[in-house]
A protein has these predicted regions:
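Bacterial N-terminal signal peptides that target proteins for export
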Residues: 2-12
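Sec/Tat signal peptide C-region and signal peptidase I cleavage site
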Residues: 21-26
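Subset of outer-membrane beta-barrel
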Residues: 27-347
């Protein structure tokens, strides 16, 4: 197979990196294991898990076929508190997101506290309606010395000694951002382990300025996210989990969804300590995503890889993004633990 001309490949790479730089202004970061970053989907998904507390981390390494890969890390923690003598509960959380992208070293750091109130809708404590809020501080920064433009093309070749022709008032921007969401979760059927949820979130409700040129007309567009999922037993040892998100922000649309098959290991299948999972997800028009997951309660780990199926697959050599997620959740030794307080959803 004929190798692409190195000059053509260079400019294609430069164009893709530039488009990634532009997309950082207008679109949000995303994970293929979106189900392992619940607060980024919807603040009203905080606390929807089996336990009193949960700590999660996701790391994404994208487009390693290029010199400067895109690297993203997410960390979130959640802690559930009972509300008086009722079956309601309040979840307090924290979402931290860090991203570094492209040759210009564009970095983004976000720190968002979150609150989610879950109202019990059943005296069996098997269904809840939640209202969540998340808001905090964002910093974005670029390395001006690494910004390249077509002004550095001297007619024959790229010349880094030429000025890039750009003047930035500041190499960083800071702003406050906020999200709000609602969700419903509950059990269904005759098996307690069968559960489902639906959610709707509205991100960037304050439309913060998002310009290194201090242009107040350049706003971060609001984003709507519709989420849904279900987990159900097939037999004593087998279960399926279905998850999907539809989001739109400005002119951008994204649909991602898929299914995981879980096989329960060990003696106690009603409350298994070990579950081996394998599944596949699809980001429509962009990537096919195989996933392997292992639950070793209270610890869970998952690995996924994006197989690029978009028009960029030729330049990226079919390489997409590798992701690793780790989750730790458990109950506290207390009288009002969620273990005794509610029938927890299984997500």
């Amino acid at each position: 197979m004929k190798k692409p001309n190195p000059i053509i490949k260079y400019f294609l790479t430069l164009a893709i990196l530039a488009s990634g730089f532009a997309s950082a202004y207008s679109q949000d970061l995303h994970f293929s294991q979106f189900f392992e970053a619940p607060l980024l989907r919807n603040p009203a998904l905080a606390g929807i898990f089996t336990g009193d507390y949960r700590i999660q981390g996701v790391y994404r390494d994208q487009w390693n076929s290029f010199t400067n890969a895109y690297r993203t890390g997410s960390f979130n923690g959640e802690y559930k508190l009972p509300v008086g003598r009722t079956d309601d509960y309040l979840t307090i959380g924290l979402q931290i997101l860090y991203d570094k992208a492209g040759s210009a070293g564009l970095t983004s750091t976000q720190v968002f506290p979150a609150l989610n109130y879950s109202k019990s809708l059943s005296n069996r404590r098997s269904s809840y309606l939640s209202l969540g809020f998340m808001g905090g501080y964002v910093e974005k920064r670029i390395d001006i010395s690494k910004v390249t433009t077509n002004s550095q093309f001297d007619g024959a070749a790229f010349n880094p000694s030429l000025g890039n022709g750009e003047t930035f008032p500041s190499p960083d921007i800071h702003y406050w951002d906020a999200s709000v969401g609602m969700s419903y979760n509950g059990t269904f059927g005759t098996v307690q382990q069968n559960s489902l949820f639906f959610g709707l979130a509205y991100h960037h409700l304050n439309r913060p300025m998002n310009s290194f040129y201090q242009n107040t007309a350049v706003e971060l567009q609001p984003k709507w996210v519709v989420s849904g999922g279900a987990r159900f037993n097939v037999d004593e040892r087998s279960e399926f989990t279905v998850q999907a998100d539809y989001s739109y922000q400005g002119t951008a649309r994204e649909v991602i969804g898929g299914v995981m098959y879980g096989y329960k290991l060990g003696e106690f299948t009603d409350d298994p300590k070990y579950v081996l999972g394998i599944g596949a997800f699809m980001r429509i028009g962009d990537a096919f995503i195989p996933v392997i997951k292992l639950d070793m309660l209270p610890l869970s780990m998952a690995i996924s890889y994006d197989v690029n199926i978009s028009t960029l697959s030729t330049v990226s050599q079919g390489q997409g993004g590798f992701e690793l997620s780790i989750s730790y959740k458990g109950f506290l030794d207390r009288e009002n633990s969620a273990k005794n307080k509610m029938l927890c959803p299984r997500f």
